[in-house]
Amino acid sequence: MKKLATILILCGMLLTSVIPAMGMDYGDYLNSALEFMQDMYYLDMDDEEALKAALKGMFGELDPYSGFYDNQETQMINDSLQGSFVGIGASLEKCDEGVRIVRVYEDSPAERAGLRDGDIILAVDGVSTFGKEPSAVAAEIRGEEGTSVTLTIQRPTGRLDIAVQRGLVEINPVSWRIEEDVAYIHIESFTSNTSGSFQKAMDEIERRGITKILLDLRDNPGGYVDEAVAVARKIVPEGLITKLDFKSERLSDKEYYSDLKNSPYLLAVLVNENTASAAEILAGAIQDSGKGVLIGQKTYGKGVVQNMFYVLTPEAYAKYGKKYGLHYITSVEWLSYEGVLLDPDDLLGTIKLTTGHYLTRNGRAIQGVGLAPDIEIADRTLPNGIDLALINPLKNTATLTLDAYGDDVCQAEKILRAAGYFNGTPDRRMDQETQEAIRKFQAENRIPATGDIDAQTRDKLNERLDALRAEYDPAYMRGLSLLKSF
């Protein structure tokens, strides 16, 4: 209920008191169309199913970004944009024995309980996972915050039961590292916690006196405009960031500004054809400000914005209409105009609607056009599915041996997979498959084939990482080289 109230207030702030006159009344016509669909369609559907189908068709045909979503679909959208969810914090994949954990999220209930990448889940609360899809197992693991689930785990050392208390899982959309005098920052998407995570990176960057930033926005689909603006305000000098221009008089146009004086940062921004929406707002603000260059391919060109509107059930629509003598279909209208906060049971789902477009600092409209890079260069390729830019160089000081566990093991497996030595899924455990790949790598590089990652093997793996980036990610290398030249 608290999340719903917050979303409604945020939407309500956009609505003004201007209510345009209604057009033609299609009430009887639409009712007849719904009755015809229910009668003639070969499968049975109740009134609510028919209404949802009609709404999906009505809004889904407007453009690729608009649509109607029922309450379950709405929750999934909200979870993805919030950057957090209630669960244990583990990604799963199918394997012969059941389901394998391929990633345990940092500081998650799963990590605190002692689960590890590579653990095989044999049972959930005593119920076997054999033959089940990962999505089905994930549904069995999910539950209310504060409750517990017991997972039967298979490891090389044996079988054990681990009880995990479900809780809030935060997904960090920002990753970063320092390479000599350059900070590399990758933003995956603009969820509700992006700017906070970005600030943590900036705190360390400022502490170390670094002013050169390689910002990776490739494949970033966008997200919350406010979050992209908040990031821009930390690195873009004072002036307009973007302007939102809405068609409806009930939505107030909005301009976002940066107040940052004398920005010290020199920026190289990696973009490609999948850099879209809010990511283009940030990239456009950097380009127009003259504080950075775009490197890569022309961006996607999504220069329009959407709003989410909760819509009432027909029963709630009739109930509130009778009580107030008004006919609003969305909860944000009831909140903005009448101060009525609806109960979640009154809601059928949400309409995501394209309501306007945005302009860059210099007044560019990029819908269907995109942002042209200052330096056009071929996009990266992902050898064996590995994004080389996201690999951190190995830093281990102690030799990593069989059953070693940690981030360095995961990074080594990614390098080995990209180079064709390792066929498994990179995780944080060094098992026999990992060691066999290391032995092949060591033998080809004239290193004693122990299967362990000692200092010599570590350095050779880091050298291979540099060589792979040069071969497969020219945009990354160009950005890094450009910044280091200053």
Language-model-detected regions and their locations in the chain:
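Sec-dependent N-terminal signal peptides of Gram-positive bacterial secreted proteins and lipoproteins
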Residues: 1-23
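PDZ/PDZ-like domain micro-motif
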Residues: 25, 106-119, 172-173, 408, ...
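Extended, small/polar residue-biased N-terminal targeting/export presequences
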Residues: 40-100, 148-164, 173, 473-477, ...
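A short glycine-leucine-enriched loop at secondary-structure breakpoints
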Residues: 109-120, 142-144, 285, 418, ...
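Conserved PDZ fold ligand-binding element
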Residues: 110-132, 213-216, 437-447
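C-terminal, low-ordered peptide segments at domain boundaries
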Residues: 122-210, 253, 367-398, 465, ...
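Conserved acidic, small-residue-rich alpha-beta core segments centered on
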Residues: 207-214, 220-385
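Short acidic, glycine/serine/threonine-rich helix-capping segments at coil-helix boundaries
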Residues: 399-465
